[in-house]
Amino acid sequence: MCIRDRPGAVKVKVLLAQALFGNPDILLLDEPTNHLDLDAISWLEEFLINFENTVIVVSHDRYFLNKVCTNIADMDYGKIQLYAGNYDFWYESSQLIVRQMKEANKKKEEKIKELQEFIQRFSANASKSKQATSRKRALEKIQLDEIRPSSRKYPYIDFRPEREIGNDVLFVEGISKTIDGVKVLDNISFTVNHDDKIAFVGGNELAKTTMFKILAGELEPDEGSYKWGVTTSQSYFPKDNTTIFDTDELIVDWLTQYSEIKDATYVRGFLGRMLFAGEDGVKKMRVLSGGEKVRVLLSRMMIMGSNVLMFDEPTDHLDMESITALNNGMIKFPGVILFACRDHQVVQTTANRIIEFLPNGSMIDKITTYDEYLESDEMARKRQVYSMSEDDENDN
């Protein structure tokens, strides 16, 4: 099979192998974590940490940048500013600088007002004329710091369920599915509770996407069943949105069909939150960029007001500001979330339960955070047992 026909993750791995071959003096990486699963990203992090030569990397993955980078080059305000430290240090430092400039300007403005009031009051007073003149000179010396508007724009992502979710959310019983002769799901069973935010993890990308498609009603299982609770309403963010955007329909018209309020101004409000300004709402669906498509789908999820959200790789094509906004929206959401995501920080800060889909189609289910899951010896032993059982089946 030609490289062009391979999945995105395989293409990235081939490009990485090409870049890493020969131990280069300078390694240039432009979004190297795109399409890689969390295990592959973890391997890349460790490799780059131990790489002795220079690395220049562009990435939207905050956790990756924190692990790998020793310096951050901030491209904003029409210039580049270099910071020593990782991503979190840069973020805190850059925010602190802006806050300090604003506070300094505020004090200067207060001083300007005080001087202007004195000058206006006493400039015609002969006994105070020298003081007024002195204050005029002081006023002329005060210069406000120029705070240029940042090129960074943060969307406003706020998922508000219209109905509170009940105790019975989702029951999955014995689901199996074979695709192209490979059993990607093998007797999968789990129950979702009303306070769950579950991350689907593991290198079996097809298993995760297949599970989402089944739960969204887009695919029938070969065996088993699932049942949503009567109080639930679901919104689904698909990994592949090709068919959704294969239309000449306008964004605002397409989005209106998912809104109970059939008012263009109301719908445009949701688009505005997602940085679609002015006439952007009358763009045709098929001409949108990858990032715009993601923001339209997130607008749909907000406007639907569901109490169960399902995300299959929502951070693909998003910039760091949008990922941060999505992360915050997921954390604040009071309903249930089922999601797969390659962004370590999104998984760690959102999930309170981990379901790992293994290569043999089985799963591991654990109520824990993602970092605790990775550090757990118990989970490592379980993965080894499943891996050994898969090897035995292959030998037979």
In which residue ranges do the predicted regions lie?
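ABC ATP-binding cassette signature C-motif
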Residues: R4-N105, F159-N396
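Intracellular alpha-helical coupling/juxtamembrane segments of multi-pass membrane proteins
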Residues: S93-E146
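Short, flexible cytosolic linker that couples an ABC transmembrane/permease module to its adjacent nucleotide-binding
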Residues: R148-E164
